[in-house]
Amino acid sequence: MNTFDINTITRENVKSLKPYSSARDEFEDFDTAEMIFLDANENPFQNGVNRYPDPQQNSVKAILAKNNNTKQSQILLGNGSDEVLDLLFRAFCEPNKDNIISLPPTYGMYGVLANINAVENREILLTTDFQPQVEKILEAVDENTKIIFLCSPNNPTGNSFSDESVVKLLQNFKGLVVIDEAYIDFSEKESWLTEIDEYPNLVITQTLSKAYGLAGIRLGICYASEAVISVLNKIKPPYNVNELTQQRAKERLKDLDKIKQEIASIIEQREELLKVLLEVNFVEKVYPTEANFILAKVDDANKRYNQLIEKGIVIRNRTTQPLCENCLRFTIGTKEENAVVIKELKLLN
């Protein structure tokens, strides 16, 4: 049994911090519809956004909690998932002392945020089939290791990590295991959200930028124990999610049928593109995927990338990433966009 204790990993200055209290925080338990607000030095003339937004985004959290069978107190929202990830560093990692573990090839912001926050990033490569090397990860852990980052389904490889590997890390690591589920909606695997109450050191990040089609509003989600969320709430900026973002998110989150249709279309087009890539003569390998993209190994990634750019098709060249030499990542577009990509791929020499 993992004897995880939030107090042992929280930074001392954060533990003693008295968080900033915004004007609106003081009235969250009141019916504010008829109240006159003269407390925050706002412009009083109504235009839809003249007032500060709800600092706790309660109406958005209520929908997320209902949709995912969790509690509002287990949710933190951020200005994109990157803000959520940054808050984790700032709450739990002491600069120039602590370290985190990431598993390349993976999402690059874990390493970037480690550098920004003066935290050592210990990289443990995935296996050749892109699975965690659990024993090597645990061997790399020391008393100053605060977070292990797992991206599952993984970017840029597209595959999910085995349940056995994740459980072993959750059970044997006394810091936070952060599972980045940005692409979970495209996978047949169940989200780790169902295990939050089982593992107090489990943190899950999700986003509205992928399956929900709201990359432009920047809304990231963190699910964790109430203890972890309470620490993050102490250090988050008071109005980190603006009113327009909150309104648009609520509209979209209530339209689950349309979202499911779009996800189904993306998965259908993913399978179409996958079949074509397997037949293209310069494609050497197509990796299994549970995301809205496909990673393919080609004969010359730089050459093929530039050829597609000349045709007006922008993909991602991942050849500089560990274990991804000569690999290209194809995001799945609409049926019409996919048709153009397929046509041009067949014409390339």
Swiss-Prot record:
Keyword Oxidoreductase annotated: no
Catalyzed reactions: L-histidinol phosphate + 2-oxoglutarate = 3-(imidazol-4-yl)-2-oxopropyl phosphate + L-glutamate
Disulfide bonds: none
Coiled-coil boundaries: none
Pathway: Amino-acid biosynthesis; L-histidine biosynthesis; L-histidine from 5-phospho-alpha-D-ribose 1-diphosphate: step 7/9
Enzyme Commission number(s) from the entry: 2.6.1.9
Listed GO biological process terms: L-histidine biosynthetic process
Family assignment from sequence similarity: Belongs to the class-II pyridoxal-phosphate-dependent aminotransferase family. Histidinol-phosphate aminotransferase subfamily.
Full protein name: Histidinol-phosphate aminotransferase
This protein's encoding gene: hisC
